[in-house]
Each structure stands twice: as structure tokens, then as C-alpha cells.
Amino acid sequence: MTLIDFFSKDQFAASAGVRLTCVREGYAEAEMLIGPQVLNASGCVQGGALFTLADLAFAAAVNTHGPLTVSVNSHIAFFSSAREGTLHATARELVDHRRLPYGEVRITDDEGRLIALFTSSGYRKSNATIEVDSLM
């Protein structure tokens, strides 16, 4: 099983149309095709959908080392709205601390316009690991 296979079991992210496209050590990419299920009442992508996209990308990036890592604190800033196309999330682990990693996720649209910026701290659990054969 790959790390992408492991995270494909995230039913909430899957229901929002989020999927991982690339994972390597401390880095991940995910995308979300904008559909009616992620639009708010004004026809823009709902903030929770953007958070879900970023959260999955962050989770993949910080879980490339073995120990199960969970988010403990996250922040998202919204810069532009999106209504159609595909959203792209690029996650980078900025601090690879043995217990408290920190990362950033940039969400852009098909034209490369910055839609949102997500930052998060994680906690590496000492009693749980993710058993995978490879990242991709």
C-alpha cells in the first residue's frame, strides 16, 4: 500500500472530490475539481471545502516519515474566490521536528492565482505509525 492509498480512505475528503496527486518526503500535491457539492449559497467554493483540500495535502506531507502525525493547530487565510475549474494544493513541511512538524499549503486555481494559504502544526504520535510500502 502507498501513502496515497492510505489517504484515499479519507471518506470526507473523497466526498468533497479531493485527491492526492503527488507525495514525496515532506511534500504533497492534491487537487479538487470544483462541483456543486463544494459551492456555498453565493456560488463560490465554500471555505470548509478549501480547508479540507489543504488539510489532506498537509496530512500527506507530514506523514511521509512513518509516525502517524495529526494536526493540532491550523489557520487558513482566503485571498480570492473560485467558482469553476480545478483547485490545486501544494503542501510543504517547513519544520521536520521529531514531535511537532509545521507546514504550509498554498491553494491555487488553474491560472495559478492564490486562492488560500493554510498553515498547520502537527503532532507525531509515539504509539502509532502508518505502514506503507512506498509514498506513491
Regions found by a protein language model. Give the residues of each.
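Terminal targeting signals and extreme-terminal segments of soluble enzymes
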Residues: 1-136
